[in-house]
Amino acid sequence: MIIFQRAKDTEARHNKQPYDIMDFKKRLFVGLLFTLTAALTVTAAPRSKAAIKAIAAKVFKQSPTLMTTRASKDEPRALLANKAFTVMGYDNGGFVIVSNDDLLPDVIAYSNTVFDKNTNNENFKWYLSAAEEAIKDIVKSGKPRTMVPPDQSKYAAEIPSFLTARWGQEKPYNDLCPEGTTSGTGSWQGYGSTGRTLTGCVATAMAQILYYIGWPEHGIGTHSVNVKQADGSKKKLTVNYEESVYDWGNMIDSYRGHYSKEQGEAVARLMLDCGVAADMNYATDGSGTFTENACQGLKRNFGFPETIQMLKRRRYTEKAWMDIVYNELNERRAILYTGVDLKNGGHAFVICGYDEAGKVWVNWGWEGSADGFYDIALLNPRSMKFSDDQDMIIGLEGEKAELVQDTVTVETPGTLDTLIADSTKSMISLLKVNGKINSSDLRTIRQIAGNNADGTIQRSSLATLDLSDAVIVSGGEPYIVDGKRELTTKDNEIPERAFFNCRSIRNL
């Protein structure tokens, strides 16, 4: 987590002055008038349980993000409820956060992941806590809140998530992190007091963005941090970035299953270098740093230009802030976003997409846990004390890799995969396919478009797909495996789900 310095509380000073009985009556009348006026303006109407359930069911039915999670025919049930919102979903995955009052938009967030009310995902817990406070504050004020959707005269109506990594802070990500001890600020994450330190959520966010960019090939210069030891001493750790070669080809989207030694070492090297560049305060119970340090480290050790910026939320109106967010995401630039928790410090995560309503896709940096669309603008620091330190780093793009435009003619159905080199699949921006193609070929096209048959996501540059001179035929391996369902092609028919969740394709 990020460690923020907290300002000391100050007491307001009140000068008591005498007043006469008429002044008292005036004050009393004004006070009563204000109370009555306030009571009249509060028109909050709590949503019934039936209404909340209906809202969630509608989202599950209509949202592409949640369609694949509806394995059960049962209605979603309440997984968590408080005075501000209700989390509706399924035990096997998929949840919707519904506001309990109609002063707010009905849906606060939704995700296709499993909701765990006892999660140790500190970033997600921060959002739940902050959203609860924000909703209570809005209901208390009696002023309705509307979202700021993307201006479709300037931006795309929606940008599907384009970040494919689902990384975390423990093994193998922290395999090269230094040995250390606890931070001394609490052991809320429950890890041991001595041993291997965690990467820190700032480093994980940085690393996921660099992996998405696939740049640079190596770092610049050297940098050092001091790591606290169990005996109270500090041990200096130095990284020579000139010797760090980033093995992008051996990094994978998820390390939750099997991975090779080389794949583990590749991501561990990147994580360490990100942490040191950001002046990480390494600890076994939570490593932290400031957003400013991450921004400077990206410039100093990774070669990012001076044009990258760290912006503070409290300096912008909600509309202006979200306009910056939409602009970055339209340019396919991931945003490193941070928010403060007055109890547990700060939290860093990645924003990498948005829906038509203006909810942004959040990658919490917890191996995919709770990733989904969230109303981040709800947390307005101009009216809520808790979010005074929301920041974001924008302008994060590296040197563009040379993309490929390819035309392939399939002579024998099912052979498309053999006609395109694996090393170029992620770099194809325009693909034209001629000839007869079957289900196996469609499976390959979906893979190039960033979506494997089992639904896992991988890096993709494919923006334009041309099948105008292709003929769909039956046969081949299934192009989608959804539970027990295996979808295959039929003659002269493009299946409805042929390109479902192929997030990179913009022209077909």
Task: Label every PLM stretch briefly.
Residues D20-V30:
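Bacterial N-terminal signal peptides that target proteins for export
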Residues G31-A39:
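Bacterial N-terminal signal peptides
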Residues L40-A44:
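Sec/Tat signal peptide C-region and signal peptidase I cleavage site
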Residues A45-A81, V96, D102-P172, L176-C177, ...:
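Cys-His-centered catalytic/binding microenvironment captured across papain-like cysteine peptidases
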Residues R70-N92, Q296, R300-N363:
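Active-site-adjacent substructure of cysteine-protease-like catalytic cores
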Residues L104-S287:
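Active-site-adjacent structural segments surrounding the nucleophilic cysteine of cysteine proteases
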Residues D406-V410, L430-K436, S460-N492, C502-L508:
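Structural signature of tandem-repeat unit edges
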Residues A498-F499:
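Hydrophobic anchor residues at the C-terminal helix/turn of individual leucine-rich repeat
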